[in-house]
Swiss-Prot record:
Top-rank lineage group of the source organism: Bacteria
Catalysed conversion reaction: ATP + protein L-histidine = ADP + protein N-phospho-L-histidine
UniProt cross-references to Gene3D superfamilies, sorted A to Z: 1.10.287.130, 3.40.50.2300, Histidine kinase-like ATPase, C-terminal domain (3.30.565.10), PAS domain (3.30.450.20)
Top-level taxonomy: Bacteria, Pseudomonadati, Pseudomonadota, Alphaproteobacteria, Hyphomicrobiales
GO MF entries: phosphorelay sensor kinase activity; protein histidine kinase activity
List of residues that carry 4-aspartylphosphate: 876
Keyword Transmembrane helix: yes
Phosphohistidine modification, residue list: 577
Gene from which this protein is expressed: cckA
Protein name, UniProt field: Sensor kinase CckA
Keyword Phosphoprotein appears in the UniProt entry: yes
GO biological process: peptidyl-histidine phosphorylation; phosphorelay signal transduction system
Sequence ranges assigned to domain PAS in this UniProt record: 171-212, 313-341, 432-505
Transmembrane segments: 111-131, 139-159
Membrane topology: Multi-pass membrane protein
Amino acid sequence: MRPKWCKTTVLASFPRGSACTARQLKHSANRIYLDARASVPARRAGILNEDRIELPDDAIGASAERRSTRDLRKPSRAGIQHERAVGLMSRQTDNTYPKPLVMPKRGPSAALRLLIVGILLMGAAFIYFLFRDQLGDGFALVLMGVLSMVGVFYLFGAATGLIQFSQRSDHQDLAHSFMDTQPEGTVISDPRGQIVYANQAYARMTGATDADGIRPLDQVLASEPAASDAIYRLTNAVRDGLSAQEEVRISGGLSRGANGSLAPVWYRIKARALEGGAEFKGPLVAWQVADISEERAEQERFFQELQEAINHLDHAPAGFFSANPAGRIIYLNATLAEWLGVDLTQFTPGSLTLNDIVAGSGMALIKAVKAEPGTSRNTVIDLDLIKRNGQSLAVRFYHRVQTARDGMPGTTRTIVLDRAEGDDSSVAQRSAEVRFTRFFNSAPMAIAAVDAEGHTLRTNARFLDIFSGVVDRDAIDRRVKLENVVHERDRETFNKALAAAFAGQASISPVDTVLPGNEERHIRFYMSPVTDLGGEAAEEAAVISAVETTEQKALENQMAQSQKMQAVGQLAGGIAHDFNNVLTAIIMSSDLLLTNHRASDPSFPDIMNIKQNANRAASLVRQLLAFSRRQTLRPEVLDLTDVLADLRMLLARLVGKDIELKIDHGRDLWPVKADLGQFEQVAVNLAVNARDAMPEGGQITLRTRNIPAADAAKLHYRDLPEADYVVFEVEDTGTGIPADVLEKIFEPFFTTKEVGKGTGLGLSMVYGIIKQTGGFIYCDSEVGKGTTFKIFLPRLIEEKRADDAPVAAKEKKVEKATDLSGSATVLLVEDEDAVRMGGVRALQSRGYTVHEAASGVEALEIMEELGGEVDIVVSDVVMPEMDGPTLLRELRKTHPDIKFIFVSGYAEDAFARNLPADAKFGFLPKPFSLKQLATTVKEMLEKQD
């Protein structure tokens, strides 16, 4: 066991006249345990070969302080010299010690008092003997009574320990011995500044030779400017009842160079207040002065050695840094700082992180190094660092990782070598090694080499990055089988592909799989056989490359979903067009029948039932067209705040009394351009959908707000461009939508409601309207907490025009003239016979002269036969041989002012793009009624060009 050196300082003080009894030793002793073999200062204090000493609390008023210095294999020379100087190395058995120069006067002891009492009693007895005749027997009885009382009191005091003789003196001697033999100077003064105690050490320090030369410490240091402030602070601390210490440096020491030396001496001065008792009428002040010059010199030597060690480490020919578990660099030597271009004057611990200096996927290599709890681990890593100027530096890490016993990571220490440096003979080889390592660890794909049994031999940084949750560096070092990073369901396919690589096949199909434990991450493996003709890589049987295809899979799923929605939309649009033709014929025929039947007619209800169901079917077709984005929109500038305010009453009636409707209007909303009626339909559909999700009641919140482009970019919604938007949200507190259902909610005819309670077209129509408007719709939902639909409408930024003034709600239609009759000549072009027949009868019933054609070619022939005597043409859009837009272009060549109306089940903009921008025409969407047809024709004829 090597010796350990410690310094123990005990400041002992006591008030004058205090007594140390066995009771005090038993109940208030402070035990100080010292290693007599190791503690030289303890020997200097007179504590020799004692495992334990007990000092009474009343006698020792200061503290026991242990200061540990550096562990040494042998005691220092200074310590041995000081030990010899004190002269206490040999064991002492007597109680001799230097007497103090100033000692408080002691009052008479108990024995002395008893002796005086005894003498007085003997004198009284002698006087009685001489004058017994005169005094009589009464005096003798009184004297005997007094003596008996004194005897009883003595016996009682001795039995109870109240009267003690030698024991009190022994304890006083022990305390005095401890104080007087202290190597530190000790002086105690009363409230008037008079010294009541001073030991020989204090006299030597101050140069006093007798009691008259002893001065209080504040007077000794009064002429020392360097110490006056320290004495002032100590005095104030004592006045406040506190203990304090200061260290001062005095030229020549306290004795002012009495020994002929003016060398500076360091002192540690301690002060504390003591209870003075009634005799001193106030507290005493105990001062202790210790010469710590050797200690300060040792500290200076230690500091110089530390500075030299830091200087050696800073300018070593290798870089060095240390990082905490969070990856923040807490130390960086000058060599590495110079390599990286880091200004050490600006560097502070934690101001740099490993991510700031490690390039590419190098962090994956560093993070993969882990140690077992309570151990450390060393590893070698080749990677690139990033200089301040952006250039890379090829280095080799000798990396040490420590882990605490509880498993918490500790501070890392790393030596960094520049791989580009070396002798001339190894430059080419070193350069090739650097280039390969840089390529290997910087490759964007994971690379691993395996042996013939599928065990992993080596991996690059990207491999550890991708598969960090499956394998770590320890597993790679143990040569774990590569199949462990493949999901169990795909391992058979993976092993077959790996066997093909072992067999030397050149073309092997890649293997797609997911990470074990995280099936949301997709991985694709590529196998390549190893042909090693030179025998340099005899162990390697195949090289496996892997890329993460999670984003690719997500894009593929999005594309498939988009194509599916587009295909469904095209199908829905085609079906809707055909249905519109059928419904148009039914509705117009119903109107013709109703004109010939009164309400009292028995068949009138049946005809009305036919028309009502036809209109209901027409509503479903409109929803299909909305989803397929083929309905006609009339966009206008809208202020959503006003639109929702006008809708509030309607929405409140729709959601019912059990559901609270809350509308949160955003401030200063930007204008948007949308079809007012269609937007109202969107709001109604979403509110009704939210209502149905809360059968037991809840809350629906409609919210609007502006989102700048910068905030929109942070949302990470799929396909949402970075732009300014006005967001319309519909939030409910309903049951929520499961994830598997959430992907299908916008598909037409998809519904989770019971049969007869929903068509499955509500959200499909919302989706189509928003897409056709140029906006985006997303749904966030959590089962059991509710659903939020978010609609992003692009901000309208353009100069305001008179006809684009924001509107709050749908303007009331101006009442049209009830007279729908006319005498104009109409050319009706329609390939559907039923629709054409109904249109002809409807217009003829209003007084029009109608000519009919089944195609565009036939219409041109009729126009030629009539010599152009046609006032208006009503034409379908999609027809065989020649469609409606082509017919319009041909007619305008010879009849530029002819009026033209298109009728179609598709949206107006679906065919308007095929016409000149200045083309003028009317539009009537299918299905339409007899009245709607007559009204449109009448308005077009009366319209002034």
